[in-house]
Amino acid sequence: MLYRKISNLIENHLASRTNSILLIYGARQIGKTFIIREVGKKLFKNFIEINMIEDANGPGLFKNVTTVDDFLLHLSMVAGGELGDHDDTLVFIDEIQEYPELITLLKFLRTKGKYTYIASGSLLGVHLNGVSSIPMGSIMKVQMFPLDFEEFLIANNVGIEAIEEQKKLFEKELSPTPEEHSFFIDLFRKYLLTGGLPDAINEYLRSRNIHKIRAIQNETREFYAMDAAKYDKENKLKVERLYNTIPSFMENKKKRLIVRKIEEKKGKTFSDYASELLYVVNSGIALEVDAISNPFYPLAESETKSLLKLYMNDPGILSSIFYGDNIKAILNDEKSINLGAIYETAVACQLRANGYDLFYYDNKSKGEVDFLIDDTKSLSVIPIEVKSGRDFMVHSSLNTFTTNEDYGVKKAYVLSNSGTVLKKGIITYIPIYWTMFIQKQSFSDEELIIP
């Protein structure tokens, strides 16, 4: 079984017997159902799983449910003999987006207190926007992502102790040994091939067959397109076109979204694709990175420009599009191959999984920096530059950015293939696989006490 960090959150939430109901949402094929099932069966004597897509395609028992009594009646019809009470029965409502009004009903199911509930959905990020009454305070929404690099390491039997040792080096700004660097950079490149889809990683662990891995990734992309056609019928072609053009945007030097390229139509603006952009981001199949030209902490309060980048939600999917079954392009570090788009996608996915909202710096006169994130410890912005080549110490835009006193930057990172950690002023050069350690600041209990 693949280790998922979110399992700790799910287990703690359910074990706490809190009144709020946990909703796990995210893209398809990332392991939501599996991990909830594993944790639920571990903690509860009775585990009831109801897939609402299967119900909609079958008996439709829950299609017109509008009250708690109706829900409990139909629940007893499918799982009567397995139902206990609140403390020993977990009811898992899977693919809840199929019946959006059930999201509203969760509040009243919680109040009734007959059983414990948890829910998940592939398109909750989309459908929550259309729910008539979201039960605020009654639900806890958590977005799930494909496996990040740290989870990939654990899947490859890399010990927690070894990962923690790397984290200590990161915190002390010390270089790994050449042997350690060779080991981790090799696994990072393999992660660029497999990505974080559970089925793709399991196939890699089972067979190492790139053709089979690519088949899984390609099938997942097709699933995403099918979902778009099903849940946004009016604009499905525009959604598919937008999603399918993301790789081509990644191949451009600036990598930003060019509106006229989506449908090859002049005169189009972002407003013409507002709903489509909302879909690909809220469904979890793409990551949005907004442009900021005058950044200040917190970034959410900085004025954004009408520019953005879209990244695929998984580096393996992007590498399958760019390189197919050719693994040499990534594993052999070919000089003629620019892996910038793949590297940036991996970094975007890791930072997003670490809980960061993503921005990038774009200023006509001062250049561009790949990523900007908030640092809650120093109350400042951290700029991050991603370098896939050997000229990783060349970054004029980052230099300009970090020396601008108005921005108040206290720390910056350059991520590259190099295993040598360097510190030049406020810029720290670290191996790209250490992105997993760029995490939101956590505080001790003592520091949280208000005097």
Segments predicted by a language model, with ranges:
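N-terminal pre-Walker A segment at the start of P-loop NTPase domains
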Residues: M1-A15
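A cross-kingdom feature that marks ATP-driven nucleic-acid transaction machinery
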Residues: L14-L23, A27-Q29, E38-K45, V281-P451
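Conserved lysine of the Walker
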Residues: K32
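Short glycine-rich substrate-engagement loop in P-loop NTPases that contacts/grips substrate
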Residues: A56-H86
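Conserved P-loop NTPase "ATPase switch" module shared by AAA+ and STAND
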Residues: L83-E101
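Structural recognition of the conserved hydrophobic beta-strand(s) that form the central parallel beta-sheet
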Residues: T116-S122, Q143
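Short regulatory helix/loop adjacent to the ATP-binding pocket of P-loop NTPases
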Residues: G125-K141, L153-V158
